[in-house]
């Protein structure tokens, strides 16, 4: 048992999906996993272990933002021996060519957070995905006929920005979307020499608000990224 996770060692698989929303973790467990068992309910951050196509996998919510995912991901890696972590979550498009319900595979994550500069104040440390996972996920998504974009994202500390034009300017530099967790996850993966990838569904188009989705849709209907995430986990065995 760790500080924030009530599981025993062995209760959690060495590969895991990490949605931000704990109810999305429950949805994945109930709709994709067989024989799923809940291993955590502390702070309402639900976690489950079951099997997917005969492979043992886990899924757990992380909450919103880099401090929250950093707590859970670190404990999963250090205390429970997790080796492969895939974030499945939502993002807002800032690229005019990226639309709602399409997938973004986060090849790299820029950030406006100081979470990494706390360790390296003198320079920028690039946050990158594991290429093997990225390659597998891309080909799985394409084979399934999903519209998929590969590129950088911005991991932001701020959801309601007072200067959205600064974020939108990044879209002109090839940044696909804004989210709130990938940079911290990639940094932890680099520290502990494990594999990590972010797979995002576009839930909001900051260039066209008419494309936005409801809270219920975000929780239960973005199944493409869930399928790609699970298939990537088992293909990585």
Swiss-Prot record:
Q: Where, in this chain's numbering, is a purine D-ribonucleoside bound? A: 4, 179-181, 203-204
Which cysteines bridge via disulfide bonds?
none
Amino acids binding phosphate: 20, 24, 43, 87-90
Q: Which Pfam families match?
A: PNP_UDP_1
Feature type site, description Important for catalytic activity:
218
Domain of life according to the entry: Bacteria
Q: What is its EC number?
A: 2.4.2.1
Which keywords describe this protein according to UniProt?
A: Glycosyltransferase, Transferase
Q: Name one GO molecular function term.
A: purine-nucleoside phosphorylase activity
Query: What's the catalysed reaction?
Result: a purine D-ribonucleoside + phosphate = a purine nucleobase + alpha-D-ribose 1-phosphate; a purine 2'-deoxy-D-ribonucleoside + phosphate = a purine nucleobase + 2-deoxy-alpha-D-ribose 1-phosphate
Show the GO cellular component annotation of the record.
Answer: cytosol
GO BP term, example? purine nucleoside catabolic process
Q: Which residues does the Swiss-Prot or TrEMBL record annotate as the active site?
A: 204
Task: Return the broad EC class.
Answer: transferase
- Which InterPro entries does the annotation name? DeoD-type (IPR004402), Nucleoside_phosphorylase_CS (IPR018016), Nucleoside_phosphorylase_d (IPR000845), Nucleoside_phosphorylase_sf (IPR035994)
What does this chain do? Catalyzes the reversible phosphorolytic breakdown of the N-glycosidic bond in the beta-(deoxy)ribonucleoside molecules, with the formation of the corresponding free purine bases and pentose-1-phosphate.
- What family is this? Belongs to the PNP/UDP phosphorylase family.
Q: How does it assemble?
A: Homohexamer; trimer of homodimers.
This protein's name: Purine nucleoside phosphorylase DeoD-type
The organism encoding this protein is Streptococcus uberis (strain ATCC BAA-854 / 0140J)
Q: Which gene encodes it?
A: deoD
